[in-house]
Every structure is written in structure tokens, then in C-alpha cells.
């Protein structure tokens, strides 16, 4: 599982970096030729794309390293750090766009040959849609937070390129402030995406529990297993591709230790079949030692 995860995540990071570099060169030419502030917005975004994707590429490779003596739980948290760094990069580009857009709203300037800008934007739109489709497939397979953050960023690029097409079309017909207005709207959307991405990264760094649906699946597996009378103290978190799951099983007092161990092993394997690659810790408690107030299962 880890080999497949590493291969897919690395390919997604390389694809994003390569596409960002190619589009940057095209957008530099288009901005120089047309003077469009919307294309400048796209150019700045491509610079951020490159910085973010390179950060992803380096951090993902680090996060895939196996656990060592100093990092006994592995290096998966590096993915959350990459997502947090991306959110800061993107916020900076959004603020730059605000300033540039306001300046052009106050003093609009006609652009040269919007047709060139439209052609470049169509190319960027098609390439970005292809990349986002590939990234979405990788996220479904790996649940990588770094790739998900990159995908959210490029999804905003799809909307941005669509808005730029409209702005260039309006400018072509003499609505010169449309270029700056759309660039301002793009900046607002980019900032929103950055804040959302940063929030998710911080939650992961703070060891937020797995989604309710996944925790409920764990509860269902455990409480329906023969030999398990109940369960409590479920604790979960995720670091990179690895889910960490801890739970206490309640068993009959007179159950032999060997049999209790066998039941716990079976439950662990059942959880691993549902969530491959997880780190599962199970503690067995005799029913008589479980306080009455925690008999009823609660998510922790």
C-alpha cells in the first residue's frame, strides 16, 4: 500500500510542477503581449503554483520515508506542513491581486489584442482540467492531504481561467474595467481557498479525529464481533496516509487470556481489511472493571 501511495502521490506532484512551469512561460508571453491584468493574475497564480508544487514534491518525498528512531510514528505530518505552506503562498498572491486590481479599476488601460490572451487562457483551462481530473483520482486512491490541497488550488485555477475568458471577451468589446473587476473577484476566491486549505492543515496538525463516518464503521466492526461485549475510548487521527486507531474492548471476565488475545487479533485484522495500512492498538478490559458511566459507547 505504501509503495502504491508513494508512486501515485509523487506522480501527481511531478505532473503539477511540470504543468505549472509550462503554463508560466505561456502566460508571461501573453501578459507581455496584451497587458491584461487578468492574465497578470493568472501569471502570479502560476508562480504560486510552481512554488506550491515544488514544496509538495519535496515534502511528499520526505513524508514517505519510513519511521526512524527520532520519528517513531513516521513523517506523514510533513504533508500537513506542505498544505499549510501552500495556503500562505496562495494568500500572498491574493493580496497582490487585490492591489493590482484596485489600481487598474481606478485607472483602466486598454489591452492589446485580447484574442491572444483568449487563446492562451483556453490552453491553460484545458490543461488544468486534465490535471485536476488526475489529482482527484489520486486523492480517491490515497487520501493524500498534500495532493488534495494542490487539487483545491488547481480547481480554483479552473474557475479563474473561466473568469479570465469572460473578462477578456468583455474587454474586447470595450468594457476595460471588466478585466480588473474579474481579477479582483478571482483574488477574493483564491484567498477563500487559501484560508480553507490552511484550516484543514492546522486541524490535521492538531490530530483531528477521523471523519464520523469512518469512526462509525470502526464501531460497527468492533461491537458486532463475536466475543466482544462492548467497547469504549475510541481515539483516532491521521498522519499522511496512515490512520492511527486506538480502542478498548470489553470482554467477559472469565474469558481465558489466550482467547481474549485471539479475539483482539481478529478485530484488529478486520479493521485493517477495511482501512489498510492503519496503525491499530487494541486494549482488552474485563466487563467488571469498566465504570458504568462509560459503558455506553461514545466517540472520542
Curated annotation (Swiss-Prot):
Family matches, as Gene3D superfamilies: Cation efflux protein transmembrane domain, Cation efflux protein, cytoplasmic domain
Alphabetized UniProt keyword annotations: Cell inner membrane, Cell membrane, Ion transport, Iron, Iron transport, Membrane, Metal-binding, Transmembrane, Transmembrane helix, Transport, Zinc, Zinc transport
Listed GO MF terms: cadmium ion transmembrane transporter activity; ferrous iron transmembrane transporter activity; metal ion binding; zinc efflux antiporter activity
Keyword Protease carried by entry: no
GO CC terms in record: plasma membrane
Entry's transmembrane regions: 12-32, 39-59, 82-102, 114-134, 156-176, 178-198
Entry binding sites for Zn(2+): 45, 49, 153, 157
Subcellular location: Cell inner membrane
Keyword Iron: yes
Catalytic activity from the UniProt record: Zn(2+)(in) + H(+)(out) = Zn(2+)(out) + H(+)(in); Cd(2+)(in) + H(+)(out) = Cd(2+)(out) + H(+)(in); Fe(2+)(in) + H(+)(out) = Fe(2+)(out) + H(+)(in)
Lipid bilayer topology: Multi-pass membrane protein
GO biological process: intracellular zinc ion homeostasis
HAMAP family cross-referenced by the UniProt entry: Cation_efflux_FieF
Family per record: Belongs to the cation diffusion facilitator (CDF) transporter (TC 2.A.4) family. FieF subfamily.
NCBIfam families per UniProt: CDF (TIGR01297), PRK09509.1 (NF007064)
Function: Divalent metal cation transporter which exports Zn(2+), Cd(2+) and possibly Fe(2+). May be involved in zinc and iron detoxification by efflux.
Protein name, per record: Cation-efflux pump FieF
Organism field: Salmonella arizonae (strain ATCC BAA-731 / CDC346-86 / RSK2980)
